[in-house]
A protein has these predicted regions:
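Membrane-embedded helix-loop-helix hairpins and adjacent transmembrane boundary segments
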Residues: 1-502
Length: 502
């Protein structure tokens, strides 16, 4: 399909989002609207919209691609998804009640109230680092596809593609913030979910499969193995590692992440927020299973038609991230190509827009103390918030350009590797603040501990086969990271004096 035609559909899509942004923010664009949507969001709208935020372009492209990669991933990712589901239940049962009880805007205020100001800013800084990297990775994923299949043929350089993407996001988020994003993410989730089912339909149609035949083709293929239970020590795909990693990555990347928790905190009350979480979890598991099914069908189709996995332009090695766009845009074309591109755009921008808003919120609340500023006028605060919003947009641009210069790994592996190192300290900090309330931590030592823990984890991971008799870490390394942070805080803390005793 012509790049111009694809681009015209994408432009139309963003014009729709900008119109929605105008309609949702014309009555109010103050900071209360931007940060917490006036705490008036409907739980079922939040639940559905969060699907698009949680899945992102990572799921849309890389998960189907990983099904048939040379490492033999197959459906092993579903083990991780089951761990995610367990993690969501933990978040709903433990963290949400805490956040609502404390009536928070930024969830990192929990750390400030229990451990101290330095610990508070350390937690927020680790979130800013984690979310900046995560948002940049996700936007990078869609940008390289847009570049390869649309902008390269137009002679547009990669850096300009990123600038255009960020300007579009900024255009529909800078006024309404979270209130706008809750609505736009719901619309984007509609496009995302529709594109999954339509992709399955188009692939099945090309293979002359009905639903039953497609199910049996996937089941009988060598792509559909879910549970890996052999070689616990050396197998990264072992169920225990994937399941535990899924739980703790969810706690870190969801429950301790301002982005996704900000949406939950916009619900009217705790009960609504918990209904939102439980509904979201069920849909999340089902949608991921469909994404894996898309992957299996893509490889079945590719094998039948003799389609090779496209090569990376830099490394000249097969890159599974490109298989889905290659088939959708160069082999199916027409309506399937448009469906794919809109689905990919929705998946990625639903994540990036809310990430940008959460970064702005955290910086404004945790560092600039907007909620405690009683002297500045509302217009002054809004102007300052807008500058912060622009600043993070520029930062994400720079990080993406850096990724483009050095990245040659699978995006899925890279994003969760980053999460393992940056969210571990958050887990340790929150765990200590919740379960070591009878101890006073040396507040100034917190940043050092939170930096040392990931460094130690890096070396533990690198030399694990030597240190632990051949053991190979997977996503469960985040548990070790959090535990090291907890132990470090324990070492630099002391028991609180008993009241009434000198």
């Amino acid at each position: 399909m012509s790049p111009t035609v694809l681009l015209s559909f994408i432009i139309g899509y963003f014009l729709m989002l900008i119109v929605v942004s105008y309609l949702t923010s014309k009555k109010s664009s103050d900071n209360d609207t931007f940060f917490i949507a006036n705490r008036s969001s409907k739980w079922y709208i939040v639940a559905f919209g969060m699907i698009g935020t949680a899945l992102s372009g990572i799921t849309f492209i890389s998960v189907p691609g990983e099904v048939g990669n040379l490492a033999g991933s197959q459906f092993r990712y579903f083990q991780f998804v089951l761990g995610n589901a367990a993690g969501y239940f933990i978040v709903a049962g433990i963290l949400l009640p805490l956040y609502y009880k404390m009536h928070l805007i930024s969830i990192y205020e929990v750390i400030g109230r229990t451990l101290g100001k330095v610990s508070h800013k350390t937690a927020a800084a680790f979130f800013l680092l984690s979310r900046t990297i995560g948002s940049a990775f996700r936007l990078y994923l869609v940008a390289i596809v847009l570049q390869r299949f649309i902008f390269d043929e137009m002679g547009v350089p990669f850096w300009l593609t990123i600038v255009i993407c960020l300007l579009l996001i900024w255009g529909y988020t800078f006024r309404g913030g979270l209130k706008t994003i809750i609505i736009t993410d719901t619309l984007q989730t509609v496009f995302l979910v529709a594109s999954v089912f339509l992709s399955i339909y188009f692939i099945c149609h090309s293979l002359n499969f009905n639903i039953s035949q497609a199910f049996h083709a996937i089941k009988d293929s060598h792509y559909s193995k879910i549970f890996f239970t052999n070689n616990f020590v050396t197998n990264k795909f072992h169920f225990t590692k994937q399941f535990l990693g899924g739980i703790f990555v969810t706690i870190g990347m969801f429950g301790l992440d301002q982005d996704l928790m900000q949406k939950n905190l916009s619900c009217k009350n705790l009960k609504d927020a918990q209904k939102n979480m439980l509904s979201f979890t069920v849909i999340f598991v089902i949608i991921n299973l469909f994404f894996l099914s898309v992957g299996a069908l893509l490889y079945i189709y590719a094998n039948r038609e003799g389609i090779a996995i496209p090569l990376d332009a830099t490394t000249h090695l097969p890159r599974t991230d490109y298989l889905f766009p290659e088939i959708a845009l160069n082999h199916f074309k027409g309506v399937p190509a448009v469906v794919f591109m809109l689905g990919l755009t929705a998946a990625t921008f639903a994540t990036t827009d809310s990430g940008l808003t959460a970064l702005t919120t955290s910086f404004c609340i945790d560092f600039l103390k907007f909620d405690k500023n009683k002297t500045a006028s509302e217009p002054q605060m809004v102007r300052k918030r807008t500058l912060v919003h622009i600043g993070f947009s520029v930062l994400i641009l720079l990080v993406i350009l850096l990724f483009n210069a050095v990245n040659n790994a699978s995006v899925v592996s890279a994003i969760f590797k980053v999460a393992t190192y940056t969210y571990g300290p958050l887990i340790g900090l929150f765990a200590f603040s919740l379960y070591a309330k009878k101890r006073n931590v040396l507040d100034k030592a917190t940043p050092i501990i939170c930096i040392l823990a990931p460094i130690l984890c890096f070396f533990i991971d690198k030399y694990s086969t030597v240190l632990f008799d051949g053991y190979v870490f997977a996503e469960e390394l985040i548990i070790v990271n959090g535990l090291l942070t907890f132990i470090g805080l324990l070492i630099v803390s002391k028991k609180k004096p008993i009241e009434g005793i000198n």
